[in-house]
Amino acid sequence: MDSDSGEQSEGELSPGHESFNSKSLALQAQKKILSKMATMAVANLLTDDTSSEILDELYKASREYTKSKKEAHKIIKDVIKIALKIGILYRNHQFSPEEMETVERFKKKMNQAAMTVVSFYEVEYTFDRGILSELLLECRDLLHELVEHHLTMRSHGRIDHVFNHFADVDFLTELYGPSEDYRLNLRKICDGINKLLDEGTL
């Protein structure tokens, strides 16, 4: 479940060459992780157009903030790996009744965080980086609780890597700041989130 052969070279970007596509990355990870699984449907959420667009914009914003294509790529790759592994556990009924309660709590918290992301963008002067950061960190803690008995410390490290980045108050300040590049990223992220909310996916 938690092995990652070829971790060092997978997905590295050559200097000066910008080539990033979250759908392609999700499909690569899906093929690798699920090569021995009966179903390939578990990653559908990550490979639909709307989710791919959101991940692409998160990559661009992360690349701009970190000034590192490699780091931004790793953040999104960790998002995909976490989602795939949790999806496998969920679809194979590996969670106990108590853990399923944690799943529901996580879904509600993610829904709250998603609506907050959009609200802070759509309603002027409402952005509060502390509130949004706290919501994302609560999502992180619920995920740790959920996979405690299922995944390795490496996966827990990925969860920290992803949520600590997106909950970074300095990153959130830049994302919601006046920069046109970040505003474009945020608008597309919120458009995608609104679609997922309307569809009941989030």
Swiss-Prot record:
Pfam families: DUF758 (PF05527). One of its GO terms (biological process) is lipid transport. It is found in: Cytoplasm; Cell membrane. Keywords: Cell membrane, Cytoplasm, Lipid transport, Membrane, Transport. One of its GO terms (cellular component) is plasma membrane. It comes from the Eukaryota. Residues 1-10 have a biased composition (Acidic residues). Residues 1-21 are annotated as: Disordered. Its main location: cytoplasm. Belongs to the TNFAIP8 family. May act as a lipid transfer protein. PANTHER family: TUMOR NECROSIS FACTOR ALPHA-INDUCED PROTEIN 8-LIKE PROTEIN 3, TUMOR NECROSIS FACTOR INDUCED PROTEIN. This is Tumor necrosis factor alpha-induced protein 8-like protein 3.
